[in-house]
Amino acid sequence: MVPFKLTNKVPTDTGPSLISAQSVPRPIVFMDNRNNTRIVTPTLPPNQHRGISGASTALPWSPESKNTGKYIWNRVKLKNSPFPRYRHSSSFIVTNDNRIFVTGGLHDQSVYGDVWQIAANADGTSFTSKRIDIDQNTPPPRVGHASTICGNAYVVFGGDTHKLNKNGLLDDDLYLFNINSYKWTIPQPIGRRPLGRYGHKISIIASNPMQTKLYLFGGQVDETYFNDLVVFDLSSFRRPNSHWEFLEPVGDLPPPLTNHTMVAYDNKLWVFGGETPKTISNDTYRYDPAQSEWSKVKTTGEKPPPIQEHASVVYKHLMCVLGGKDTHNAYSNDVYFLNLLSLKWYKLPRMKEGIPQERSGHSLTLMKNEKLLIMGGDKTDYASPNIHDLQTSETDQGEGTLLYTLDLSSLNELCPGIMCESLHAGESFSNSLSGGFTPSKSTESENQEIINILTPRLPDSKVLSYNDIDEGAGSYSSALDDKAFERKSDREEKKPQSSKVDSSINKESPGTGIKVSKKNFPVLRGLTVDSEEYGSSSYKDTSCQKGIPKNLFDDLNLNLQTLRLEAQQKELETARHISQLEKEVQRLMVIKEASKDSNFQTARLKNLEIQKTFLESRINDLKNLLMVKLSQASKLCDQITIQNNGLKTCSEHVTIKRDIIDLENKCDVLKRQNEILVNNMQKITPELHTYLNESSCYLGKLLKSYPTSARPPSSEKDNQIYEKDSLNKIEKVINEMHETVRAKEKLHLETQKLNDERDSLRANLLDNNNKLDALRKLSDGSSKSMDLTKKAIHLSQSELEKYRKNNDDLQKEIDRIKTEQAEQDDKQEQRGAITHGNFDAFHRMKINNLKAELYMSKENRDSLKDELLALKKKLYTLEQKK
């Protein structure tokens, strides 16, 4: 691997879209042999890029505060974490099975080239992660790159990396990752490519299921900033004529930008913020592919300040912007929302509980349960070993890092009016003829987001049902459907066709249906389905492996019945169109015959009668169609009502379950307290009874001894002496009782002290066990390292023996040649001087070559000796540590 190296020479065909800025020093790459990870050593970033998340606000971590539902911010610990890393890239939305993919990024002096998969549970309260193996097509280590997800393809482009293209410039390859088969593919487009860069953004717009386009905008390379807009057709990436298209839009073009954000909504691109060559921007620009026009959006409300290195994502019809840093390198953790319909900004009220520390260079991912996931950035976010402590630590304690989630379910309450869908200044976001998706109030947020970005669909266009298509053409796929990628388009309803029919349609007999297959429809002939991928990998990661729920099976059955009705309706419509064509032909034939007989009025009357009959049949067909549609609508209403009732029941069950869990926890606490009190009472009661019994017995003895020992006083003096003795005895008894109580208290204190010492010893024992486990792991790692070192030493010794043998062979060859040369010198003394000189020159040259080979062998032998010595030293060091 070579170090980062980038020439300042830029092709002259880039035009006015390139503007100079300050250059950035280039990092150096190296290999980390310990974990087989490709790492790049860059120059140190600014101090603010390497800040530590210290005393930031956090959720309460005491065991008593278990009710975190009232917080919109929450923190989750990720044990095996790929973070911290800065200016990485991740998928902006989870997959159907709640997976997120993370690539690249920077931490301290290392640039990563690994790929991670983070999986979330259903409610987004816990996460697991695993590293994906690296293959030959995996992108090299990079930072500042851009990525997006399209169907089952995770797309990566650009970034600051050591890899150079054939012209010595930054890597300009496009990388496609199949999230099912975990394989990377590198397309090979022809013609001109966009320059490799970093700080740019890419987004997906699909005008129809057969054409998915990837848009690239902005970025920088050292002193050069970009505002060019380039598009690549992902649906044709395997075709030999696939290529990048350099657009030349009109309108109010944005300035050259880097470290901005770009999202796709309503088949348009929305660009916000970023750094220009002169300042930092907080403007919003919109690009309309249908018109190939840029426009600067005029917004209202509480607009964010100029920021860069922030993150954004689309939620319903809102563009969410989080974090970043301003012109003074002041970091932010504020959250802003732009209503893309009313073009009004809203700021999320600041709530300290659980909010992440100010950051930049992080990533933002939209989850299915109306939550945003914030990962990474310039802060370390190390987790604490205490399971209840959700504050960040300054050092890595082996417990992973913290992830942050933002709950958007109560967004309308926090920002009143934010979900308003009124259009701004008469602008319309309705569906165009080229396709697009306009969110509506009846569309669920999660599906809407997936439709707009993840797998865009064609609006109001019906795709043939299962029963209409021949076996083998059961699903649509774009050109991504092959051994590396498969992509299926969803099925939607189609508007009724008009009665105008092309005259080139072949006639069929009335009332017969047409079988729909690839042969009948050219659009199906261009589609291929990889049956192996469709049957295995595309369903490999779904939840169906655990069994299909009954309600889901019922829904699928209902949808299947609906599709069958639509297929029958399609056959009826086709037969009706054929019948219309035949009637039209009959009408024309009647007119033709009437014109021949010169009886125009009769022909006209017949024509009108035929038209009347045709219109009556058409009205009857429309009535039947209306009845079918009404029945379908009623079924859909019933289904919606059932689903709403089910959702209400589920929500009630969830609330009741939470209350039950809280009550059970409180009951457990009270039971434990009651048990402690009962145990204390049981310990104290016997002692108290014993003490009272002893006191009673002692007093009884005193009372019994008093009458027998008492004597009638003979005088007043004797009475005084007797009373004094009695008082002394009573006082002595009382003193003994006090001493007994003090001794008991002393014993109780000593018992508590011993219990505390016991708890301390247990804690020390637990710490020692943990340290022992860590030492065992270190010992295992050292043993593995020693084994690898021994293998390396053995290989080095074998190589050394090989070089020694070669050296001996060369020495023997030299001796043989010297002997032959001496013999031939004697023979050539008799020959002429010219021949003798040429022969000597030839042998001298051969001897010189052999000497050079001998010298190289000696050098290799010396280097192997040095390497062997270093390995022995390393082995000795490991043995000493062990």
From Swiss-Prot:
Coiled-coil regions listed in the entry: 550-685, 728-881
The organism's place on the tree of life at top rank: Eukaryota
Swiss-Prot/TrEMBL Kelch repeat ranges: 99-143, 153-207, 213-267, 268-317, 319-369, 371-417
GO BP term (any one): negative regulation of exit from mitosis
Disulfide bond annotation, renumbered to this chain: none
Polar residues bias (residue ranges): 498-509
The UniProt record lists the keyword Ribonucleoprotein: no
Keyword Repeat in record: yes
Modified-residue entries (Phosphoserine), positions: S509
Bias type Basic and acidic residues, positions: 480-496
Keywords recorded for this protein, A-Z: Coiled coil, Kelch repeat, Phosphoprotein, Repeat
Annotated spans, Disordered: 41-60, 480-516
Phosphothreonine, modified sites: T455
Any one Gene Ontology cellular component term annotated for this protein: mating projection tip
PANTHER family attached to this UniProt entry: ACYL-COA-BINDING DOMAIN-CONTAINING PROTEIN 5, FIBRONECTIN TYPE-III DOMAIN-CONTAINING PROTEIN
Note: Present with 468 molecules/cell in log phase SD medium.
Subunit-level organization: Interacts with KEL1.
Name of this protein: Kelch repeat-containing protein 2
Native organism: Saccharomyces cerevisiae (strain ATCC 204508 / S288c) (Baker's yeast)
